[in-house]
Amino acid sequence: MKKNVQYKGNLLILGTAFLWSFVGIITKAVSYNALTVTGISSIMAVLVLVIYNRKHAWHMTPLAVWTGVVIAVMHICFMVANKHTTVTNTIVLQYSSPIFVVLYYRIFQKKKLKKQQLLAVGACFIAMVLFFAGELTMRNMFGNALAVLSGICFAGEFYLCAKPENDAVLAHVLSHIICIAVCLSYTGLFVRQEYDWRQTGLVLLSGILCIGLAGVTYTIGCRMTTALNANLIAMSEVIMAPAWAFLLFRERAGSWPAAVLMVGAIVYEIWFEAKEERQG
């Protein structure tokens, strides 16, 4: 891979992480219900994806549908978690996903875990315990639990989209359609919501840029750089989102030792997998 191409790919992934880092910030900043935010932003995100992939040959399969459901659950859990716990806790716990990918391969494909993988998995679960032990309210614990579930589904997205017979583009489009149907139906039936144009505009912008455009830049960037670079650079979101949360809300992580342990374990796991792939 040419260095200038890889450099551009790295910049695209960094830009993606920058856009992603504002999703939780905007969700927490507006007064709207989290499901309302998810539904409205998904409208714009699906429009961006459909326009960008207008020449895509769509292949509707049960696998694509199930993948869409998993991604939709991931989006919903992530958005709701941001309303119930800190932005830092939410993003760090969601990025536990590589550990769950390892477990999926062990459970569904019977791949034996190497000692390095067991070490990373163990460290992540210890970090999760520390996150929950540091929370004194049921509200924050509920948010942390949703963030973990978001990470489990995020891992499911990677695992299912990697299957060659799957139509990952269709799965992502379906996920946003599901979010629109479920979230806006719930909002219409059960949520008394007062809207104003500033907050609605912010949520719409989030859907266009932070979800829709970010999905496009991530797809292009991954084609132009290595898997290791893409994973590690995308993880800069774990630094950016807490920084914005502190600057805007003076919000701190529930447990910095847990956050450092979690991020360290995930970086180690990504590095180990890349090393194994290079060695064949």
Please tell me what each predicted stretch does.
Residues 53-90, 94, 126-130, 207-225:
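Specific transmembrane alpha-helical segments of multi-pass solute transporters/efflux pumps
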Residues 19-32, 76-85, 93, 156-167, ...:
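Juxtamembrane C-cap of transmembrane helices in multi-pass membrane transport proteins
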